[in-house]
Amino acid sequence: MSRSLALVYLSLLCLQTHLSISVTVPIPSVNGEIDAMLNRNGVIGEEEGEEMMPSEISRRVMMMRKQYISYETLRRDMVPCQKPGASYYACRSGQANAYNRGCSVITRCARDTNDIKT
């Protein structure tokens, strides 16, 4: 009888210890940096109680990770093709279908595209 009572007390002690540890120790999240940034208080330009739009959240996450399109890329004077008004597909000479990808009319690898007016 005393052995079963000791087992019950030991079980209760283990359960109580487990619960007290699991409540006080936070489990690290996979996206800890993003969560910290999004939950941070006192962000410049943000008032308390104001919810951010999904685009604003995405912008902030991209800025944090340094994955964004730079202003150098968006300059107006940088054109990908030197021929004004030319399609990007007709811009550079060379092999158009370098690897086995789908063939379409716009890449001019499809058969009988001469009669199609674009």
UniProtKB/Swiss-Prot annotation:
Keywords assigned: Disulfide bond, Hormone, Secreted, Signal
Disulfide bond entries: C81-C91, C103-C109
Single GO BP term: cell-cell signaling
Pfam families hit by this protein: RALF
Protein's cellular compartments: Secreted
Proregion residues excised on maturation: 23-63
Main location: secreted
InterPro entries: RALF
The keyword Glycoprotein is assigned to this record: no
Domain of life: Eukaryota
Post-translational modifications reported in the UniProt record: Proteolytically cleaved, probably by S1P, a subtilisin-like serine protease (subtilase).
A GO CC annotation given for this chain: apoplast
Signal peptide range in chain numbering: 1-22
GO MF annotation terms: hormone activity
Annotated positions for site Required for proteolytic cleavage: R59, R60
Known role: Cell signaling peptide that may regulate plant stress, growth, and development. Mediates a rapid alkalinization of extracellular space by mediating a transient increase in the cytoplasmic Ca(2+) concentration leading to a calcium-dependent signaling events through a cell surface receptor and a concomitant activation of some intracellular mitogen-activated protein kinases.
Family membership noted in the UniProt record: Belongs to the plant rapid alkalinization factor (RALF) family.
Protein name: Protein RALF-like 24
Organism: Arabidopsis thaliana (Mouse-ear cress)
